[in-house]
């Protein structure tokens, strides 16, 4: 996706539209070459895909948002036979590759840009923005429960945990209790209704760079779209479909996602199984080696040009010849939150 970036992404840089973040660093880490096959798991406005295609590589581009896929049809015509658009969750990118290229097909690279796209924020009717009035939706696709469903149906304690863990909101409990009280009189259905209620409760320091509702909106979006679960499953899927020497490049904008990616690459570096509490059981061969040292951030010039890039971090790994390690979602430390499918039935 052409991601917005950090927590204050709606407050700053509003004039910057659909600018791919860390594009030079992404291309340098990905190293696409003519004839290579690259998966862009988060197509969005197509910024990464276009630059990859310009190197001569072919792209399988995935997005769960049908609006993004439809907008990308023009690019598909611009690069005939070299761009395949797939409407799908990026957690199923291995299935998308099999559908496009055949079962067992491996690829040369995978790039993931984690977060909401600027196209989605800019369209008030999608309900992602706390600065524009629209339905309280936030779904990246049309299926499943909306943010309004979560706000109006979840228990107060569950809302507080979502705001705390997924949004790192320090007023999580107060906001959840306010929502419980207000929704009893009138359900929340509009973005500005919720944003204004939060601002009234928490207050706003003129020196604050972010709106008081920023972290709550982030948490609801991440919850409704299962963004952390999607990322975890996408990393494991990328491990399965990359050729030896293939590269996985991930750009994140929040500490939650960055910690998950960091933990994944550290785990996939192999080594002994076990911990200080348990004896070592066996040696695990690495499935990835580092492609860059640590996390790469934007240059001062990019931050000035595009404030949305300020919180971006890039991590990348190179696939080894060793088989994939076990699919273990527990390594990501995801919290136990109410299932959205249960919410849809409530």
Swiss-Prot record:
Keywords: Cytoplasm, Methyltransferase, rRNA processing, S-adenosyl-L-methionine, Transferase. Its EC number is 2.1.1.199. It is an enzyme of class 2 (transferase). The keyword Transcription regulation does not apply. GO terms for cellular component: cytoplasm. It is found in: Cytoplasm. One of its GO terms (biological process) is rRNA base methylation. It catalyses: cytidine(1402) in 16S rRNA + S-adenosyl-L-methionine = N(4)-methylcytidine(1402) in 16S rRNA + S-adenosyl-L-homocysteine + H(+). S-adenosyl-L-methionine binds at residues 46-48, 63, 90, 113, 120. GO terms for molecular function: rRNA (cytosine-N4-)-methyltransferase activity. SUPFAM superfamilies: Putative methyltransferase TM0872, insert domain, S-adenosyl-L-methionine-dependent methyltransferases. Gene3D superfamilies: Putative methyltransferase TM0872, insert domain, Vaccinia Virus protein VP39. Residues 270-346 are annotated as: Disordered. HAMAP family: 16SrRNA_methyltr_H (MF_01007). Belongs to the methyltransferase superfamily. RsmH family. Specifically methylates the N4 position of cytidine in position 1402 (C1402) of 16S rRNA. This is Ribosomal RNA small subunit methyltransferase H. It comes from Brucella suis (strain ATCC 23445 / NCTC 10510). The gene is rsmH.
